[in-house]
């Protein structure tokens, strides 16, 4: 049985240039969607899975929302339905997938009899040419719903309560599975022990997580996850995977190949237990991110000549950010606008930002460190602007609720 596994499409406007009146980053996402649809036409999977976060932003203007829904259906969902025996579309998180958008998709595609949209947990048996398969669907969950029952709980307690609930829900649903038929878990959650987009490891208490032991306890033959944008095999005995986003979304994705999985489930002969899963990763035509670094010598050379020291090959057609090290005097002389123009002329798709990584303060002022929190950083910034103590105190008071919410 052949399974195409994708997720985290994040269709919508992303930070980047506008070309011919269209957000060019959105067009990058559509190009990845079309590639997946083309590969599905070649592979003809028994089941195609979209494991949540089809859309990028839940709350957008009406015209943008209509464009997103239209492109999701015409460029992605309908082509997949034509190429696949079944298409599974899972609701992700509410800050990305809007419930009303999913209702609209459901209404417009009601003629697609092989499309299965899951906005609530459940188990469904699908019949394919390779045999029956069960889908255990576990859409994303808004932990804010628990605040009514546990008001005043801190973030870690809230995460642990939601984690206990969602793992119990998953175990409860698994009792509905027919163990004689292959089953696939489709979920949109963080899995404890998985690698985050920035390379760190998620632990229980940091987020609402599904435990690897819970996945193993369900007895499913394959687990297809969405939510984390870094493709990876998960740390459990069950074959379980994040497919990641098909397109790079930010600089956390730099240097990471993005795409989708093609899984094959091989069932044992009749009367013998067990299945085997074979997996292959297919890379999409993603838009690359690239960090262009400049040392003091590079900054001096550019300031003197107005020309880039070098234009590395990865810079071509990439979303570029600049990180530079120099003295305070060198920074004053650095023409950032001219640097951006030169990078674009050298082939960069878009220059996202030009920021110092380290500026040596010859006056001896202490440097900003990674240990400083937002409060300390704001105090330092206001001091640098030479804001009066009274005004600084007023601004700090206004910022306090926002900083607390962010923490």
Tell where the protein language model's regions lie, with residue ranges.
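Mobile, glycine- and charge-enriched loop segments
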Residues: 1-28, 175-196
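Beta-strand-turn-beta hairpins that frame and shape the catalytic cleft
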Residues: 1-4, 11, 16, 123-137, ...
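Divalent metal-coordination and catalytic microenvironments
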Residues: 8, 33, 48, 53, ...
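Active-site environment of divalent metal-dependent phosphoester hydrolases
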Residues: 10-15, 56-59, 88-102, 124, ...
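Core catalytic region of metal-dependent phosphoesterases/phosphodiesterases
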Residues: 19-127, 212-220
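Conserved catalytic scaffold of divalent metal-dependent phosphoesterases
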Residues: 100-208, 243
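Conserved beta-sheet core of the metallophosphoesterase superfamily
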Residues: 191-272
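Accessory, non-catalytic peripheral segments of nucleic-acid enzymes
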Residues: 265-407
């Amino acid at each position: 049985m052949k399974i195409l596994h994708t997720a985290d499409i994040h269709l919508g406007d992303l930070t980047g240039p506008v070309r011919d009146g269209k957000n060019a980053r959105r067009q990058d996402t559509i190009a990845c969607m079309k590639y997946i649809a083309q590969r599905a036409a070649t592979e003809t999977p028994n089941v195609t899975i979209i494991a949540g976060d089809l859309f990028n932003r839940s709350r957008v203007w009406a015209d943008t929302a209509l464009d997103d829904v239209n492109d999701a259906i015409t460029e992605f969902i309908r082509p997949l339905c034509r190429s696949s025996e079944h298409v599974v579309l899972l609701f992700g998180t509410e800050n990305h997938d809007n419930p009303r958008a999913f209702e609209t998709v459901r209404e417009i595609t009601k003629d697609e009899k092989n499309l299965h949209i899951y906005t609530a947990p459940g188990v469904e048996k699908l019949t394919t040419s390779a045999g029956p398969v069960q889908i255990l669907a576990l859409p994303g969950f808004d932990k804010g719903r628990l605040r009514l029952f546990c008001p005043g709980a801190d973030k870690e307690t809230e995460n642990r309560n939601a984690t206990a609930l969602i793992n119990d829900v998953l175990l409860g649903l698994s009792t509905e599975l027919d163990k004689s038929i292959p089953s696939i878990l489709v979920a949109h959650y963080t899995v404890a022990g998985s690698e985050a987009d920035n390379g760190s490891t998620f632990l229980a208490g940091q987020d609402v997580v599904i435990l690897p032991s819970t996945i193993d306890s369900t007895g499913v033959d394959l687990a297809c996850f969405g939510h984390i944008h870094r493709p990876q095999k998960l740390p459990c005995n069950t074959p379980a995977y994040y497919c990641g986003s098909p397109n790079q979304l930010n600089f956390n994705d730099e240097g990471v190949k993005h795409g989708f999985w093609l899984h094959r489930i091989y069932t044992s002969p009749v009367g013998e237990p067990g299945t085997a899963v074979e997996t292959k990763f297919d890379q999409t035509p993603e838009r690359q991110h690239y960090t262009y670094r400049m040392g003091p010598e590079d900054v001096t050379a550019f300031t003197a000549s107005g020309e880039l020291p070098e234009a590395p090959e990865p810079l071509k057609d990439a979303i570029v950010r600049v990180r530079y090290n120099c003295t305070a005097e060198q920074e004053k002389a650095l023409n950032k606008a001219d640097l951006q123009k030169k990078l674009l002329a050298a082939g960069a798709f878009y220059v996202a930002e030009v920021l110092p990584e380290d500026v040596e303060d010859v006056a001896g002022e202490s440097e900003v460190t990674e240990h400083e929190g937002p409060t300390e950083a704001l105090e330092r910034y206001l001091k640098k602007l030479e804001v009066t103590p009274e005004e600084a105190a007023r601004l700090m008071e206004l910022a306090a609720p926002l900083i607390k919410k962010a923490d």
